[in-house]
Amino acid sequence: MARMSTNSTTPLSHIRNFSIVAHIDHGKSTLADRLIQTTGGLAEREMSEQVLDNMEIERERGITIKAQTVRLHYQANNGEKYVLNLIDTPGHVDFAYEVSRSLSACEGSLLVVDASQGVEAQTLANVYQAIDNNHELVTVLNKIDLPAAEPDRIKEQIEEVIGIDASEAVLISAKTGLGIPDVLEAIVHKLPAPKSAGGEKAPLKALLVDSWYDTYLGVMVLVRIIDGVLTKGQTIRMMGTDAKYQVERVGVLTPKMVNVDSLGPGEIGFITASIKEVADTRVGDTITEDKRPTAEALPGFKPAQPVVFCGLFPVDAADFEDLRAAMGKLRLNDASFSFEMESSAALGFGFRCGFLGLLHLEIIQERLEREFDLDLIATAPSVVYQLTMTDGSERELHNPADMPDVVKIAEIREPWIKATIMTPDDYLGGILKLCQDRRGIQTELTYVGTRAMVTYELPLNEVVFDFYDRLKSISKGYASFDYHLEGYRAGNLVKMSILVNGEPVDALSMLVHRTAAEKRGRDMCERLKELIPKHMFKIPIQAAIGGNVIARETISALRKDVTAKCYGGDATRKRKLLDKQKEGKKRMRQFGKVEIPQEAFIAALKMGDE
């Protein structure tokens, strides 16, 4: 690690803290690369595509998952030297909390919009968050080297949809490096310098922006200093958890780690303090000095709440301990991922895991399979329901299989979301039908040029399954979708169980709306009929709500031709053999076990993907 001794902190007027706000694929990480390259943050040989996307899966999917940060030194055209702190934020809705706390560490944002595609749903969501944080915005139109780029039309669209002046938007191509110096000048002259009420003399007050686990150094914490000075050897206290630590190392990321002696007001850097687990460092928490604490914590801290739950089971039961260890390691880096042990009659031992959303679930599952070489089965994702019992008590339900007796439940409430969908108007009809089929309530519909923006209130339960895939296929991939939780509402929900040969299969039970139960049940039974191999006896597959069977399919039995050895002759002889076979089948049905192959589970859980 390079050693760089800086005893004096940078003056506030020469610091700029900014983030880049954009929809997925609009060129945010590429722009970050160019800024690093232009200011000489890394030598040419150390540059790689998407420097700040460290995880293999981030580069492969072209998305940013963890917020990253980098400190750049820039000499402006006016001869002054500035320190620019860039925080690269995720663009996806599941990581909205990572975005919100990254934004709260900055005073300004670059709004990056693709000059050929224009404003998308997540651009809106993230811009509104930036505006809520009182950010100054500099609009940047990227990809202007594309033949399809229409900068003037997109400027109008930005003014119409977002309502900010885009006449002075900086036109760039992050890929070729065109216009990057203009972006740096705009950052220096248009974005404000950080403010510090108390300056260096005040008690230490710092925002915990992010934390990650380093195998050699333990937990590393990214901090933004608001007041006071953070130095090596200080004893600090986390105001949210009241834990105390001694600072061992203070540094900045350029994106390489560089040690410094202290961090002053307005600066962003990292510290290590022999913290054992990432869970001990709550993102958004306030850090202060133990001996001379600040009077009040920073506002807006909230622990990340899991929204979607699903069971993860190893295909091979022998991998259970490996899975437990792998999840523990992932949790070190991702405090919003939670898990607890559960066992299922059908799938054996596994874990019930909580995620921020479906992309988060997919990424965790993919990282477990790829980085730790595990084969996993994921059960159907479910959301958190709130139950009011007849005795007045409240409880949360994470797993439909654990639903108490209906008689004891007074009310079931499910989470609802507010979804914003942007789509070319050719596909609007299909999208409105999809939302209506999913019990959506339309609240707004506006047109901007040839694009429509529609706002719906939807039950999250209807979205977690395959809503996003269906939306993409209806709109040929052109629609974009963003949502945030609105709250809980009472719903007419019932638990649907699937019985195979009279035995309930716990991994396939789900909570559905009463109106959709019959169709869902019939689909599931038909799907299982195709997937479960024939046995020597006939197998009924039923979908039931309580004691009422709402759908049924029967898998016919495999039959051995027992009458083959009777040549012609006596009909009673054949009858006797057939009756004997029937007896055997009856006994088999009573005691026979139906083997449900793993593939059947996996396929049945992907219901509705067609």
Curated annotation (Swiss-Prot):
GO molecular function: GTP binding; GTPase activity; guanosine tetraphosphate binding; ribosome binding; translation elongation factor activity
Protein name as annotated: Elongation factor 4
This protein's UniProt keywords: Cell inner membrane, Cell membrane, GTP-binding, Hydrolase, Membrane, Nucleotide-binding, Protein biosynthesis
BP GO terms, sorted: positive regulation of translation
Similarity-based family: Belongs to the TRAFAC class translation factor GTPase superfamily. Classic translation factor GTPase family. LepA subfamily.
Catalytic activity: GTP + H2O = GDP + phosphate + H(+)
Functional summary from the UniProt entry: Required for accurate and efficient protein synthesis under certain stress conditions. May act as a fidelity factor of the translation reaction, by catalyzing a one-codon backward translocation of tRNAs on improperly translocated ribosomes. Back-translocation proceeds from a post-translocation (POST) complex to a pre-translocation (PRE) complex, thus giving elongation factor G a second chance to translocate the tRNAs correctly. Binds to ribosomes in a GTP-dependent manner.
Residue ranges constituting the tr-type G domain according to the UniProt record: 13-195
Protein's organism: Rhizobium etli (strain ATCC 51251 / DSM 11541 / JCM 21823 / NBRC 15573 / CFN 42)
Binding site for GTP: 25-30, 142-145
Record flagged with keyword Transcription regulation: no
NCBIfam families given in the database record: lepA (TIGR01393), small_GTP (TIGR00231)
HAMAP family xref list: LepA (MF_00071)
Membrane association type: Peripheral membrane protein
E.C. number(s) listed in UniProt: 3.6.5.n1
Name of the encoding gene: lepA
PANTHER family: TRANSLATION FACTOR GUF1 HOMOLOG, CHLOROPLASTIC (PTHR43512:SF4), TRANSLATION FACTOR GUF1-RELATED (PTHR43512)
Xref: InterPro entries: EF-4, EFG_III/V, EFG_V-like, EFTu-like_2, G_TR_CS, LepA_C_sf, LepA_CTD, LepA_IV
Chief site of localization: membrane
Pfam families per UniProt: EFG_C (PF00679), GTP_EFTU (PF00009), GTP_EFTU_D2 (PF03144), LepA_C (PF06421)
Entry's localization field: Cell inner membrane
GO CC terms in record: plasma membrane
